[in-house]
Amino acid sequence: MFQDNPLLAQLKQQLHSQTPRAEGVVKATEKGFGFLEVDAQKSYFIPPPQMKKVMHGDRIVAVIHTEKERESAEPEELIEPFLTRFVGKVQGKNDRLSIVPDHPLLKDAIPCRAARGVQHEFKEGDWAVAEMRRHPLKGDRSFYADLTQYITFADDHFVPWWVTLARHNLEKEAPNGVATEMLDEGLERQDLTALNFVTIDSASTEDMDDALYAEELADGRLQLTVAIADPTAWIAEGSKLDNAAKIRAFTNYLPGFNIPMLPRELSDDLCSLRANEVRPALACRMIISADGTIDDDIAFFAATIESKAKLAYDNVSDWLENNGTWQPDNEGIAHQIRLLHRICLSRSEWRHHHALVFKDRPDYRFVLGEKGEVLDIVAEPRRIANRIVEESMIAANLCAARVLRDKLGFGIYNVHTGFDPANADALAALLKTHGLHVDAEEVLTLEGFCKLRRELDAQPSGFLDSRIRRFQSFAEISTEPGPHFGLGLEAYATWTSPIRKYGDMINHRLLKAVIKGEAIARPQEDITQQMAERRRLNRMAERDVGDWLYARFLNDKAGTNTRFAAEIIDVSRGGMRVRLVDNGAIAFIPAPFLHAVRDELVCSQENGTVQIKGETVYKVTDVIDVTIAEVRMETRSIIARPAA
């Protein structure tokens, strides 16, 4: 009787349209209930029974109910699931398998089975890649997933690496393929094998892609020749090896090992500028005046070189600082080091006055045992030999940026536009409260940005610098020449690491076209997007493996009185994040560890400060002593507290 009643249908429709709804993202808690976060200000309570229909991170539409003046959300429609493809640990055995996603806020096991075509017999503790197949808000009874890939077994010492690479869908090994012979590129190569080229790298480096040679001219100016490994002499554009490199975009450097962009035969041997081996190279010759200015007369050319020495950063630095026992093999090598040192000092001086120089931060190196155990974490400060190479590379990349811009009008450029224009007024207002007066328009120019950076560098602490970081834009990869505000340069195009960066290989091909006087097409925009995405994934992978290894390394310090110096890097409502100075580990200090009485404590992300009873006790960039309260291995998080 009521089945096809149009009045009833209309009434239903009316009720549906009058019921308040909200769209937002589900936030789970450890207590079973959750919240629907609509925006920064508004959220609705989701009761535990309703949370069974959704997962943390799902974007949903929910019906809003009001009972006794209390609002709650009932999930109704799934807009975008949080989980699609994920990694996790398998539970159970035989026919009843489930998988717990490897995520700090997802604790529930999801029933699953091996997907068709997956041969592995899954058992308790295995790590796997899974894909969601069912969701309660899609009309299914429950969540369900397919296991699409076996990663490794529970006790594999190398779980951090294999799981992280699988999570980000990154390659686990070097690409297959061999390059049998050099291509005929129609390039005349200058024979520079008699010159005393040297490489300076870490002692363990095998993929050497830059060699340096300096000489003093009669007028006292210095001439620098930068010779770069030449993989495009072996790899034809559009070939199988080229396409594999294009997808990888970069060599992926993880703690303990790397996954190269090119086959190891090329990256570590045929292309690597090994000592006493003749190698093809792409070279740039520049003349540097006493004040560090690079003359306009820049020459790019193809060459053949033979490195005369594989030098290590620490040895060269010790020798220049008159420390240690290491000596160059002969006077020719010693002379090169002295000249390169002079170039470094004059270029560094030029950049201080005319561009920008990054503050030196140490690199942290994990020392690993054969089973992936962390034996030590060593802070490696950037020493004078590192700076020699850095100044030479920046100079060479600046030369390439100019030549590509002037001769072609395009290339693969690293572009950074400083501050987002939308933030200029807020930035000027913030600086004013700290006694720095800047013009909101001027600070958006390269000159204005450099001027401000120099003023910030002259401040007694880095606190103000840390406050304005959020107003900065991100660096991008572009085919269009543009300024790099972060370096303080009008244009910057890298070509000095073609063994490990696909963008540098592209710039090699463009520079070779310039050398030959040939026309060449502008690189496709989708290549820059692929490179940006891969750079993001590689950085996340490096961070994830690092978090895992830091947790392993500091696990036995939890609950002890061992003190660590730690720099405060961020303040949030819930507490502060710190970086341990000696090893680089990131730890979290919950607000209750800062002060027991919550009402007397104000943690302000906006101001980067922690106030107790109205007084600023901690601020970002302060260095404090902490102890490790707890290490949570399942989430790889380190909880610290201020040392008593």
Swiss-Prot record:
EC number: 3.1.13.1
Gene: rnb
Family indicated by similarity: Belongs to the RNR ribonuclease family. RNase II subfamily.
GO BP field: mRNA catabolic process
MF GO annotations: exoribonuclease II activity; RNA binding
Catalytic activity: Exonucleolytic cleavage in the 3'- to 5'-direction to yield nucleoside 5'-phosphates
Source organism superkingdom: Bacteria
Protein name: Exoribonuclease 2
Role according to the record: Involved in mRNA degradation. Hydrolyzes single-stranded polyribonucleotides processively in the 3' to 5' direction.
InterPro entries per record: CSD, NA-bd_OB-fold, RNase_B_OB_dom, RNase_II, RNase_II/R, RNase_II/R_CS, RNase_II/RNase_R, RNR_Ribonuclease
Cellular component per GO, a single term: cytosol
Every RNB domain range: 189-516
Intracellular or extracellular location(s): Cytoplasm
Record-annotated S1 motif domain positions: 561-643
Pfam families tied to this protein: OB_RNB (PF08206), RNB (PF00773), S1 (PF00575)
Keywords per UniProt: Cytoplasm, Exonuclease, Hydrolase, Nuclease, RNA-binding
